């Protein structure tokens, strides 16, 4: 019998991407609520309870409601793509490459919180250095990032693409989250194993999909004042054998004139780079990914596969 998958919110940006991916699969049965009945709470509850795995592609409050509809019904496993449960101790964090044993935790979990797109890149860079003891827990980490505008959902997509939209945005690039209170920061701090709240400065570019995340560090402030090669070796060892996360060789990175945010658009992979100069004692760690791929729908499908033993 094929496992039943219900995407609650399949008409949103992430939900549509997941639905498209699963449409090509013949090993699953995707059950869909009629669009006209999406706000029928009782019917949604029936679909949620009928599923083996429910993938929630909803705003935070709506995700909380969906989870409440499954109270006392533990046979349905949940993947939540919202921010709601990413720092909740009862939910497995859905970044399979986070640490040793994380794949198994996801595979065995009933409740999985899909990571945010920005934290996926930042944590991918920071966590290995923390686990290896190179990055002090109290280091004042700063994260700078730019995302494709699809990360803002249907509203931002319309504002960027429709010139007749009343709130049309003509900017080619803009900063937001200016008070430094972005909702991804708690997730980044917890799963990055940082004692000190990191500074996170996100921005959006005039391109649909893609993302660059940067974490600049002073080598002299890291444990043992490591070389670029040592930092690179830690990342390489951490992701050895992983098929989705690639650590670009140091020599190859040194030859690059630029990094294109759209390089991995439409793909599920993530590339990590180590840039810098020994002379100045500075390193810039860079993650390249698709905000809707490894940063959202790709990760959700990866987690679903792990939960199904695939």
Swiss-Prot record:
Q: What is its main location?
A: cytoplasm
What reaction is this protein's catalytic activity? N-acetyl-L-glutamate 5-semialdehyde + phosphate + NADP(+) = N-acetyl-L-glutamyl 5-phosphate + NADPH + H(+)
Q: In which pathway does it act?
A: Amino-acid biosynthesis; L-arginine biosynthesis; N(2)-acetyl-L-ornithine from L-glutamate: step 3/4
Query: Member of which family?
Result: Belongs to the NAGSA dehydrogenase family. Type 2 subfamily.
Under what name is this protein listed? N-acetyl-gamma-glutamyl-phosphate reductase
User: What keywords appear on the UniProt entry?
Assistant: Amino-acid biosynthesis, Arginine biosynthesis, Cytoplasm, NADP, Oxidoreductase
User: Its Gene Ontology molecular function terms?
Assistant: N-acetyl-gamma-glutamyl-phosphate reductase activity; NAD binding
InterPro entries xref list:
AGPR_AS, AGPR_type-2, NAD(P)-bd_dom_sf, NAGSA_dehydrogenase, Semialdehyde_DH_NAD-bd
Q: Which residues form the active site?
A: 117
* Record-linked SUPFAM superfamilies: Glyceraldehyde-3-phosphate dehydrogenase-like, C-terminal domain (SSF55347), NAD(P)-binding Rossmann-fold domains (SSF51735)
Summary of the function given for this chain in its UniProt record: Catalyzes the NADPH-dependent reduction of N-acetyl-5-glutamyl phosphate to yield N-acetyl-L-glutamate 5-semialdehyde.
- For this chain's UniProt record, which GO biological process terms are given? L-arginine biosynthetic process
For this protein, the record's PANTHER family field holds: N-ACETYL-GAMMA-GLUTAMYL-PHOSPHATE REDUCTASE, CHLOROPLASTIC-RELATED, N-ACETYL-GAMMA-GLUTAMYL-PHOSPHATE REDUCTASE, CHLOROPLASTIC-RELATED-RELATED
EC number from the UniProt entry: 1.2.1.38
Return the Pfam families for the record: Semialdhyde_dh (PF01118), Semialdhyde_dhC_1 (PF22698)
Q: Where in the cell is it found?
A: Cytoplasm
Q: Which GO terms describe its cellular component?
A: cytoplasm
